[in-house]
Amino acid sequence: MKFGIHLGIRGPVAHPDTLRTIALEAEELGFSYLGFSDHVVIAEDVNSPYPYTKSGRWFAEDTGECLEQLSTLSFVAASTSVIRLLTSVMVIPHRPPILTAKMTKTIDVLSKGRLTVGVGVGWMEEEIQLLNGPAFKDRGAASDEYITAFKNLWTEESPSFEGTHVNYSGLKFFPKPVQYPHPPLWIGGEARLARQRAAKFGDGWYPVGNNPRAPFDTAERYGQGLREVHENAVLLGRSTSDITAGLLAIWYKLGTSDETNTGARRAFTGSSKEIIRDVEAYRERGLQCLIIGGENSNLEACLHRMREFKTEIIEHL
């Protein structure tokens, strides 16, 4: 089983020396992945409900501070040599498809094949509108075309695509990514359509566990969701072994328990023994890569959380 760290790139950790220190420490501790969230701009008025809180309020909406995800991953790539670089997740409608394929491919080349592209359709309508993305109601269909275009651009000698949201032909797109046939694509999202997208397009399924409308915050719920992904993949003629089972436990908390929407203890919160049992239970149901939420408040708190997870959890599995 592999483990990783997820960070929002804002606040005290969004500083070059701090990011470099965190990345090198994560690599030294043996984490397999370092991932960053994706916001480009924050609207002055955010009315879109945040999927991962009961209230629907996004905890960072009062500040417009955020570093751009792909640029930050390029910076981290130059500071590290082993750890995989994860877009956790990249919101597909935020960027034009050809440019996105070029930027991600460039990171894969410069990192010598260490990029994993986690993708999602996004939740903040205002941000997608500000970035001149597709209509919010069309973002799922547009994202499917973008994903198809990414693979086409990454792999074909003479790429071309004709769709409703993406059209191109007559272009050269070199060099190709280091990873063959392309960097792994992990499909984020918890809803039924996201699970279907993972089955159709994904090299991995990468949900966040604490979506109140589609929770995977218990091993049983996660196992059921993964089974649905696998069943849909088989119907499409794919092998389930081609789909990595991931999870973002953004709510990880050692020492204090949180509750699910049913009043039960939320997985990956509580004592070290409870969290170890959670990891084992999820692993038994197919989980392969667990990414925990990092600590954004300051450098020392972030380093402490990584070291604590290594010594209190990983070393006892």
Over which residues does each language-model region extend?
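Active-site-adjacent structural elements that line small-molecule/cofactor binding pockets in enzymes
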Residues: 1-317
